[in-house]
């Protein structure tokens, strides 16, 4: 959500509307969602990944960092949007946006046991202190070692136990190839002619 006026922010706050911000998408269109202004007006905001094409990923921690950089750059203030608030925006605030904050988003008695476990035994995550800050500023989806949903272990040692990953990847590639042939966009899937030794496409 971009291009929101002060009046529209007030309406969003008054109506209890939740807002999702896709920081990479906002940067790609040379704009920003006024996350700080929304938060300070009482609007619940969560960071999201939006999509993976054409140059994005589904790495939520990467998007979180881009969101921090965008807003700190905009306000020219490194203290804008704390790391802790950003982490809340992909956990409890995201659950709130889905209307599931009584079930998900935080580790509390009575809530579902949905956990993401990170492998911290990696050089970029050392030294091991201020772990939440390490998570926000240095970790990525590649550091996720295990995932537990409703108490059920679905991924361990970076291996998903409930699906055959290779067959899914093979099927996805096959469908993508069909889509290129069907739409006539196969040439667009190649490397840009000006990829190397050029500052502009």
Task: Write out the residue ranges for each language-model feature.
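Histidine/acidic residue-rich metal-binding segments in metalloenzymes
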Residues: 1-18, 29-45, 102
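Flexible loop residues that form catalytic
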Residues: 1-2, 72, 121, 152
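Short, conserved sequence motifs enriched in acidic/basic residues, glycine, and aromatics
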Residues: 2-3, 80, 162
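Conserved strand-to-helix beginnings and helix N-cap segments that scaffold or border functional pockets
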Residues: 9, 31-32, 57-60, 129, ...
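Conserved beta-strand positions in the central sheet of alpha/beta enzyme cores
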Residues: 20-21, 117
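Short, acidic/turn-prone active-site loops that include or flank metal/cofactor-
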Residues: 23-27, 50-53
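His/Asp/Glu-enriched, well-ordered alpha-helical/loop segment
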Residues: 36-125, 136-140
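Active-site microenvironment of metallo-dependent hydrolases
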Residues: 91-201
């Amino acid at each position: 959500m971009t291009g929101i006026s002060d009046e529209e922010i007030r309406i969003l706050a008054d109506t209890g509307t939740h807002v999702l911000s896709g920081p990479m998408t906002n940067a790609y269109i040379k704009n920003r969602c006024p996350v700080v202004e929304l938060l300070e007006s009482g609007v619940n905001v969560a960071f999201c990944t939006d999509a993976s094409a054409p140059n994005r990923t589904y790495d939520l921690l990467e998007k979180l960092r881009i969101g921090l950089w965008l807003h700190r750059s905009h306000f020219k203030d490194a203290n804008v949007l704390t790391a802790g608030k950003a982490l809340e925006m992909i956990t409890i605030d995201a659950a709130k946006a889905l209307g599931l904050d009584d079930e998900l988003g935080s580790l509390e008695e009575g809530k579902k046991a949905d956990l993401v476990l990170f492998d911290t035994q990696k050089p970029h995550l050392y030294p091991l202190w201020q772990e939440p800050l390490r998570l926000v500023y240095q970790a990525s989806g590649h550091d996720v070692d295990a995932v537990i949903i409703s108490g059920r272990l679905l991924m361990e040692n970076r291996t998903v136990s409930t699906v055959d990953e290779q067959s899914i990847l093979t099927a996805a590639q096959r469908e993508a190839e069909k889509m290129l042939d069907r739409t006539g966009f196969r040439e667009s899937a190649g490397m840009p002619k000006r990829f190397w030794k050029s500052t502009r496409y």
